[in-house]
Structure formats: structure tokens, C-alpha cells
Design a protein with these regions (language model features):
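A conserved ligand/cofactor-binding region detector
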Residues: 1-256
Length: 256
């Protein structure tokens, strides 16, 4: 079998309704500044990032014989800057739209081939882009009617089907910690109550793993959260249950 592109939106889609007013900004790459606030609490800053815009499209889902219409919200990636006019005026016509092409490649093909390093990077970027857009959208909807984060898990439930959207756990932790300034223990409690997970296979080739260097390059703040989750998991769970079994602890550690 040979895979070929299907330009199914060539003539538009009457069932998809674009919602540019609900676009979301997604940060990628960059670095983390380690700083504390006036009270001495750790307040890292994710800076020098590349920005990508997520444009939502709503697909109406109508139940048979029902009076309710739900919407499946899909996301299209757009570069935050469509044209670098300074580069264009200097004669760099191709380079001037490079950011536009790179941004739009994120949502061009679902699950890009990850046999190359660039393919792995694009797949990680794509997975993060979709969950970041969706979580920001969920939070903005929640905040329209509620300002009590304790009620968040009662109003919002996220089902993770397989490993592809698992980075959503880290993104919600980042939002709670860095944006909403919630303490770690409270944020982790909210996250654990918000997410449900279904694993569809135990085959090693189907369970995703990411190199630390790649993850740190694309999502530098999120790798810090992974390491802290792992540190607490090892100290509070594994070493309490198997204090003398170092081999088991290494095998069950999130970070290799």
C-alpha cells in the first residue's frame, strides 16, 4: 500500500464552522527562567518561545431523533506571523514565509512518520499543539461560569485514549502552576481527578517514549514537570512499597 494525500478540503466543507474568535496561542521551544516571587515561591518563566496559533473548526454532531447538537472542535495550526516583511524586502521570498509553512505543517498530516528525528519532533509538536489548544479552550469555558478551581474536576473530565494525548497531563499542571499560581499538591490533586486513561495495547512498539533531549528542546518547562512528578513518584510510591528493589524502581521510573 502507498499512502497518498487526500485534499478533502479543496472545495471547502459546509459542515465545518470556523471560529476564529476562539483561536488559541500555543508556545513551543524556548527556555525556562528560574525565579522566585516576593514570597520566595518558585515561579519559573517560559520565555523566548515560538508562537503558533490554533484556529478552531466546529463539526456539528446530531444524534438520531434527538433535540441536542454537540460540536466536535478540530484545530488548524497557523503561524503567528504569516510573512516576515523585512526578510521579504531583502529578497528572501522563500525564507519570508518559512515560519508560515512550518506552522501549518503541524496539522497537515495526522501522526507524521516518526522514523526520522525531524519526524519525531513534528509528532511531539503536533501532539502538544492539539492538547494545548483543547485544554485552553476547556479552561476558558470553565472560567466563564466558575472561578473556583476546586470545582474543575466536577465540571471537566478528560478521557485519554492511548498514549498520544498524555502530554495533556503536563500541560494542565503547567497552567495550574505557572498561570494560575496554584500550589503543587493542589494542582496535582486537581489533575489526577480530571483525567481518565484507557490503554489499548501493551505492545512495546505501540507505547510511546521520547528522548529527554528532544522533549527538553520542544517543551523545556514540561520536562521539568515530568522530572518532579517522577521524583515524587519514586520517593512517595516506589521506595515505600519496594525500598530494597532498585531494579524494580529503575524499571518503573518515568524518566530513564
Amino acid at each position: 500500500q502507498v499512502e497518498r494525500p487526500d485534499d478533502w478540503l479543496k472545495y471547502g466543507n459546509p459542515w465545518e464552522i470556523v471560529r476564529p474568535q476562539h483561536a488559541q496561542k500555543v508556545s513551543l521551544y524556548g527556555r525556562v527562567l528560574h525565579s522566585c516571587d516576593d514570597l520566595g515561591d518558585y515561579r519559573p518563566q517560559w520565555v523566548d518561545t515560538k508562537q503558533v496559533e490554533g484556529i478552531p473548526y466546529d463539526l456539528a454532531i446530531v444524534g438520531y431523533g434527538a433535540q441536542t447538537v454537540n460540536f466536535l472542535r478540530l484545530w488548524e495550526a497557523k503561524a503567528s506571523e504569516q510573512l516576515d516583511l523585512q526578510v521579504f524586502n531583502q529578497g528572501g521570498y522563500v525564507e519570508a514565509v518559512r515560519e508560515k509553512a512550518m506552522g501549518e505543517s503541524i496539522s497537515k498530516v495526522l501522526y507524521p512518520n516518526d522514523e526520522t528525528e525531524r519526524g519525531k519532533e513534528l509528532r511531539l509538536v503536533q501532539q502538544y499543539f492539539f492538547v494545548a489548544c483543547s485544554l485552553q479552550d476547556m479552561i476558558s469555558r470553565f472560567q466563564r461560569t466558575d472561578d473556583d478551581w476546586n470545582a474543575f474536576p466536577e465540571k471537566v473530565v478528560v478521557q485519554l485514549n492511548d498514549t498520544h494525548p498524555a502530554v495533556a497531563i503536563l500541560e494542565l499542571m503547567r497552567i495550574f502552576l505557572d498561570v494560575e499560581l496554584i500550589s503543587w499538591d493542589k494542582a496535582w490533586n486537581l489533575v489526577r481527578r480530571t483525567f481518565a486513561y484507557t490503554n489499548h495495547t501493551l505492545l512495546p512498539e505501540a507505547l510511546e517514549t521520547w528522548g529527554e533531549a528532544l522533549f527538553e528542546k520542544v517543551l523545556p518547562r514540561h520536562i521539568e514537570i515530568v522530572r518532579e512528578i517522577n521524583r515524587r513518584f519514586v520517593a512517595e510510591e516506589l521506595k515505600n512499597r519496594w525500598p530494597d528493589d532498585e531494579q524494580r524502581i529503575r524499571e518503573m521510573s518515568i524518566v530513564g
